[in-house]
A protein has these predicted regions:
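Active-site core of glycosidic bond-cleaving carbohydrate-active enzymes
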Residues: 1, 5-9, 13, 55-172
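Acidic/histidine-rich catalytic neighborhood
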Residues: 13-72
Length: 172
């Protein structure tokens, strides 16, 4: 059985790794260090950085990973790491809406150095992930604002991703 013999062991070990990697900050479990691929931000002093903690992409992937793992545990009737995973999933930070109404790319509401950057990694939770639900109008609106801010520039692969995001928003 693929789920039991192949997928479960790989996903279980990914969960085990991240349970050990997460660190507590501000009452949440966060990834640290963390980046949003190829994008940078300005700190309060106006200095450019790329490394911080709890990027939205990281948190999106972990929410999806942990939820998937818990579903697999129920299907296979196993409970290895189940309680720890349930706890960690509840302790991941919520998605945040930033200063311009966009989905924040990082835990803090930093200013991007390039708002038109081709990467939309912080929208992973909408697509290809599924942790931003169709019923969550506030987050969907924030994703739409993020897409509009980024614009339509980019290379082939990111244009396909943006088109898929628009389709997920039922606006493609």
């Amino acid at each position: 059985d693929f789920l039991k013999d192949r997928a479960y062991p790989v996903i279980r070990e990914a969960v085990r790794f991240y349970l050990g990697y997460l660190t507590e900050y501000d009452g949440y479990l966060v990834t640290c260090p963390s980046t949003s691929p190829e994008n940078c931000f300005l700190d309060r002093k106006g200095e450019k950085h790329s490394v911080t903690f709890a990027s939205t992409m990281d948190i999106s992937i972990l929410k999806e990973l942990f939820a998937t793992y818990l579903q697999i545990c129920k299907i296979l009737k196993v409970d290895v790491l189940e309680k720890e995973t349930e706890f960690a999933l509840k302790k991941l930070p919520p998605f945040k809406i930033g200063h311009d109404g966009q989905l924040q790319e990082w835990y803090r509401d930093y200013r991007e150095t390039d708002i038109h950057h081709r990467h939309v990694s912080h929208l992973y939770g909408l697509y290809p992930g599924n942790v931003i639900k169709e019923t969550d109008q506030e987050l969907k609106k924030a994703c739409e604002i993020s897409l509009n801010r980024r614009g339509s520039q980019g290379t082939g692969w990111c244009m396909v991703w943006k088109a898929s995001l628009w389709a997920r928003l039922k606006n493609g």
